[in-house]
Amino acid sequence: MKVICYPAKEEWDELVKRPRLDVSELNATVEGVLNDVKNHGDSAVIRYEEKFDHAHLDSLSVSDAEMEEAESLVSLELKHALELAHHNISSFHQSQQFHGEKVETVSGVTCWQKSVAIEKVGLYIPGGTAPLFSTVLMLATPAKIAGCKEIVLCTPPNREGKVNPAILMAAKIAGVSKIFKIGGVQAIGAMAYGTESVPKVYKIFGPGNQYVMAAKQHVSLHDVAIDMPAGPSEVCVIADETSNPVFVAADLLSQAEHGVDSQVFLISTSEEMIEKVKEEVEKQLEQLPRKEMAAKSLDNSKLVLVKDYDEAIELSNTYAPEHLIIATRNYDELAEKVVNAGSVFLGQYACESAGDYASGTNHTLPTHGYALAYNGVNLDSYNRKITFQHLTDEGIRSIGNAVVVMAENEQLEAHANAMRVRVNEVGK
C-alpha cells in the first residue's frame, strides 16, 4: 500500500487514475462469440458452455426440479438472511416510485410524464471466484417492483451443469421469470439477440469480468441498452483521528478481496491513523481465506494524507469512488459536500458490506470514475418516462404564434405550417 503525503492539487489527476486494462485484444474474441450466438443461437451457446465453463448441457433452462433441489440445499439461516435483505431492498426501491403530476405550463397547454416499465430485462450474474447471489436480489427486486413483464437471468453452471443453489434461491425470492445456465460473452449475446431458448431482452444489467463488460458495451452500440459501463470494484474511506482503525482496515480488505484489480483508497487528516490502519490491514489480511487475492489488490491501493477535511472531500470528489465511507467525527457535515460517488456510508458503523447485502440500497454502482456522470441502479433504471401534452384552442392562442415564428426562423416551413393551420382555424 503506497502512502502519499500532502499531494499538490496538480498531482491529483494522476493520483486518482485507475489501473487500466488493455482490452483491444479482447474485442476480436468477444465479437466472434457474439456473432456466432447471433447467427446460430442455442447450438453456439451450448458449444461455448462446453468450451469455457466445461459443462455439457442438454438444456439451457433451469428446470422446476432443479429449483426445488436448490431450495433444499440452502440453509435456513441463509434463506432468512436473503428474505431480510429482499425486504429491505424492496422497501427502499418502493419509495422511489414516480408520481407524475399534470402541469399547465400556460393557459390551455397541459404537460405530464408517465413512467412505464421496460417490458423485458436481462440480468447477468457471474460465477467466477464467488457466487454473487446478493446481486440477484439487487437487480431482480427493482425490476419486479417496476413492473417488468419478463425478467431473464443468465448465470454460468459448474462442470456438472448445476447453478449455485443460493443464486437460484435468491432468484425465486425476487421473482425472476426465467433462468438459464449460460455464462460469459455467450450469455450477453443470447439475451441481446435471442435464441431458440432465451428471449431477446431490451436492457441488460449486471457485473462481470472484462470479457462480459466488453460484450455488454459491444451490444449496446446497436442492439440493446445496458445498465452502465463498469470496471473493477473500489472503495474510498475518509478517516480522521477519531476513526476506528480496526473498522477502517476491515472495510479496505472487504473491497480488496473482490479481485486482484480492485482498488482501495484511504484519505486521512491524521498521519497516525494511516499508520494504525496499515498495521491493522497486515494483521487482518493474514486471517483471510482469500488473502493472496486481497494482497495483490492492495498493490493498486493508496493511503493519502491531506491537510484538512475540505481537502479530503475535494480529493474524494475528484476520485468519484464507487463506494465512499466517511468515518470521521463530522461525517454528516462532509456528507453534504459529496457530489461524486456511487453510494455513501456514514459514520463508524456503516460498513460497505451493509450496502452490499442488506441495508436496502443497491450495490450495482458506477466504478472506474464513472460516478462523475452515472448513478447506480435504482427503480428508474427499469423504467422509461413518456411525456404527454394536450392543447386546447386556448393553448393554440397561447403558444401558436411563438411556434410559427421559431419554426420559420429555423427554416422548417412544414413545422411552421402544422401550427399555422391550427392558428388560422382557431382564429375563425
Walk through the language-model features, giving the residues of each.
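Flexible, glycine/charged-enriched surface loops at secondary-structure junctions
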Residues: 98-103, 225, 262-267, 287-297, ...
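N-terminal Rossmann-like NAD(P)+-binding subdomain of aldehyde/semialdehyde dehydrogenases
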Residues: 1-119
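Short acidic-hydrophobic, aromatic-tinged amphipathic segments that line or gate anion-handling sites
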Residues: 1-7, 178-183, 303-308
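Conserved NAD(P)+-binding/catalytic subdomain of aldehyde/semialdehyde dehydrogenases
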Residues: 175-263
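A glycine- and small/hydrophobic-rich beta-loop-beta segment
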Residues: 258, 266-337, 341
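C-terminal core of ALDH-fold dehydrogenases
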Residues: 318-428
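Conserved small-residue-rich beta-alpha loop and adjacent elements
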Residues: 103-169
